[in-house]
């Protein structure tokens, strides 16, 4: 019954124009096909609309809180107060950081320059390493051995004279200041060496001899003929010359003896020479000569060298009036005075104006020191000067001169004892101007080697002294292995035999010619002990001089006590020297005990330092077997030439104690903060 009714309704809807969507036609199309409603008779049929598609809403980015709402909330106390607190905390923090930075800069001591921070290594280039098999050391040979030098913890290489020279006075008679002597290589070799040295993080300084030139120098040859500006480049004076005999203008003597005046046949005058007659002195009262020397300084600095050792600077000026110098022995017949030591050299050395020249050289070097990390070092050689005169080379607080004059007091000691070492140390430290930096040498090319001068037993103790004294340690090549002088009696070289003894070839190994060269000959003979005293052998020996040297240089590099600390010289006797190294803020002290006597000795350190502990640990010893063990401070036993570095802690450092205050020295006062891990000077 119901089914019949549904069928009738469906038919009725169809008959009255109801349209259905079959799923393939859009509703809009169906509506367009609908008959006009006016033509369609009204009916009560129900029309079922199709479902509409949902419309998507466009989502816009969040534009933030409206300004009016923002102001409404921002003014509330719960937001305003935290905001203001954070703002002022930020401001205060910024000012605190700025203030702390400024304070650290103000209170921190000046950082050590490169020439202060580590040891220097002096090389006589003809004797270090031969690279081209001609029996002579050269620049390439030095470059080949840079790894060895680096392994010694060296920071600066110092090369002695390598300028073009006719071989007089070990190349200190320079024929051309801007050329490399061919025996050492070429300018390109030098440039390569400079680059290699800097690549290793090292610095390079070279010798410079401004006082004189070779008589082969073009300047002198032109001066002999009175050619233009060169006429007065040297010191000329009228003199009498007859029958091969010269009567000089005065009694001035050469360092090597006899008159310092030499007659020249070309110019018919005498020229002045403080050294050999082949080394005429330049006339530094001529401004043109001063400018020439400055140009030479600039030339080598532009090549990349990091500094100079200025040689023989006390001879730069002489008195104008040529007065005779006073005899040491006034009763001696004047004609018999021929030795340099027989006169007081008041008119030929350290004249007024000489230091002005040195300061002028310093200012020229400063033109190349303006770049960060490129400070140019200046050292001066001042042999045989009094301590007071030597210290003048440091300059003044407001006038810069040398960074330091080279200290050869230890290098010239012929007799070792506790007293002589103590006097050599105190004579420098007590006279050095405040704030200046000391340096120490135990050998050099102009002195006999340490082993031959005082004995091989003291090599280790002297190296320990070198690295534990305040200041810059300077090592002459071969001293790290205990090389000695050679024994020679007859040489073809045109030199004083005694001056050659400390210049023998470096002893690298026990092969032919000590590994110095592959040639069949060497310019000087090697030392006969090279089979046992050489680098290769000592590398493998725990008790060797080389191994101790490396340990000492490493300790010096790592310990602020040794580079920045106080030095307190406590006692000396005929055998020993005792001193401490200490620094405020570091809870340890190094107590150094060295025996320079001719026999063993026993020290009671309790008598010297009342509050020293009964037992002290050995940090480093010349006898490696005792390293790390303890010693009884009531009776410290030292063999001949033995040295100990003892480590302990002390509540009140010695430089604060009245009893020792006058015996303590420091160049730049500093204290250490372990909390901040920094040094500061306001202490």
Curated annotation (Swiss-Prot):
Residues carrying sugar: 211, 238, 258, 329, 510, 520, 574
GO-annotated biological processes: amino acid transport; aspartate transmembrane transport; carbohydrate metabolic process; gene expression; L-cystine transport; L-glutamate transmembrane transport
Annotated gene: Slc3a1
Protein name per its UniProtKB record: Amino acid transporter heavy chain SLC3A1
Cytoplasmic side of membrane: 1-86
Compartmental location: Cell membrane; Apical cell membrane
Main location: membrane
Region (Disordered): 1-50
Signal peptide positions on this chain: none
